[in-house]
């Protein structure tokens, strides 16, 4: 995930937290997925399955980065434009039983 500007340890931590809360899928999208991010760009994640609230809290509190996270629940209703952006530019970070 080097082209995203996210340190490998942060990706590992996100995957560990996803496993902990039975998340099925984590998708990176936005500027970090497209590769046009700035140094302080936030990390946009879309999450499917599992305990979304606990996942979101732990990612914000327990990852080794000072970057801000915007985390969206794919199991809830979200704007069509946002859902399309996730489909178009999203990069799979974690899938249950398969991590990257």
What are these regions (language model features)?
Residues 1-25, 33-39, 48-100:
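Catalytic core of pol beta-like nucleotidyltransferases
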């Amino acid at each position: 995930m080097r082209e995203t500007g996210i340190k490998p340890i942060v990706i590992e931590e996100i995957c560990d937290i996803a496993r902990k809360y039975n998340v099925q899928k984590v998708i990176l999208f936005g500027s970090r997925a497209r590769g046009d991010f700035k140094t302080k760009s936030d990390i946009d994640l879309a999450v499917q399955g599992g305990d979304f609230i606990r996942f979101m809290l732990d990612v914000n509190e327990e990852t080794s980065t000072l970057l801000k996270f915007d985390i969206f629940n794919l199991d809830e209703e979200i704007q069509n434009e946002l859902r399309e952006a996730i489909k178009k530019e999203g990069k799979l970070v974690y899938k249950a039983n398969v991590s990257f």
